[in-house]
Amino acid sequence: MNLSGRGILLSIIASMLFALFPGYVLMLAPLDGIQIFAQRVVWSIPAVLLLVVLSGQSAVLLKSLQRLRREPLLALALPVAAALVGVQWALFMWVPLSGQVIDLSLGYFLLPLVMVLTGRVFYGERLRPLQALAVACALLGVAHELWLTRAFSWVTLVPALGYPPYFMLRRWMQMNAFSGFTFEVLLMLPLAIWLIVSFGPADVYTQSPQLWWLLPGLGVLSALAFGAYMGSSRLLPMGLFGILSYLEPMLLFAVAVLFLGETFNLAQLWTYLPIWLAVILIGIDSGRMLHKQSRRTL
C-alpha cells in the first residue's frame, strides 16, 4: 500500500474511532459527562505519551518544550488553546448522555463552512464560486432551523464557532501537532484531578467494577483516534485530508439515529439537506483544487 492509501485508511479509522465515543460513553455509568471528561484527560496522558514514544516524536516534543522556555508569549497562548479544546472535549463526553448527538453532528457539518468564512474574514482568502454557493446553502439551512425552532442549539454552535479560534491560535503558534496536543492534555490534568477528587461519586469502582478497564480503554481510544488522525494528516495532501474529515459527522449522525435512538423528523430534514449539500459542494471544490495541484506536479 502506498503512502496515500495508508493515509486514506488512517483517516477512515480515525473517523470510525471518534464515532465510537458516544456509544462508549454510555457504558461509563454512573459517571456523568463532566466526570467522564476528567477521566478521559487522566487516562489519555499515559496513552498519548506512549504514542509519542512509539511514533518517534520524543525529540520533537523536547524541542517544543525548549521553544516554550524561549518564547513566553507562546507559553501564555498554550493554556488558552488547552481551554478551547477542553470545552470541546467536555461537550463531546456530555452530549451522548443528553441525547443530542445529532445536534453535535450538525456542528461538525457546519465547521468546514465556518472555517471557509474564517479564512475570508481574517486571512483575506477569496471565496471560490463553489465555496460561496456552499456558504449560501448552509445559511439557508441555518435560517430554516431558526424559523422552525426560533433558536439554534448551543450544542451545534459550540463546535461550529469554538473550533475556529482554536485552529487560528494553533496556526499562529506553529507548533508540532503531537507536541501541542500533549501539552494541552497535560495542562488540563490539574482541572481533571480537581473534578474527580471534589465531585467524583464515592465508591464508584466498587459499584461499577467494569470501570477499572473501561476508563483506561477510554484513554487508549483517545490516543488511537488522535494518532490515526495525525498520521493521515502527514501522509495526505491537505485537500484530500479535508474531504475525508467530513466522514466523522456523517458517522456521528448515523450512530445517533441507528444505535442511540435519537429522533430525526421531516421538518429537521429541511435544515440538514441544504447543509449536507453545502458539504458536498465544499468536497467537490476541494477535489478540484487537489486535482489541479496534482496536475501541476506532474
Can you describe what each PLM-predicted range is?
Residues 41, 149-152, 246, 250-298:
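C-terminal-most transmembrane helix of multi-pass membrane proteins
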Residues 1-38, 140-172, 294-298:
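Glycine-/small-residue-enriched transmembrane alpha-helix faces in small-molecule transporters
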Residues 28, 36, 95-96, 121-123, ...:
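Hydrophobic/aromatic residues within transmembrane alpha-helices
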Residues 12-20, 24, 79-96, 158-169, ...:
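Hydrophobic alpha-helical transmembrane segments of multi-pass membrane transport proteins
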Residues 127-146, 159, 268-286:
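Hydrophobic transmembrane alpha-helices of multi-pass small-molecule transport proteins
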Residues 94, 110-130, 250-269:
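C-terminal transmembrane-helix exit sites in multi-pass transporters
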Residues 9, 105-110, 177-187, 223-258:
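Helix-helix packing/entry segments at the starts of transmembrane helices
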Residues 1-13, 46-80, 129, 181, ...:
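Membrane-interface interhelical linkers
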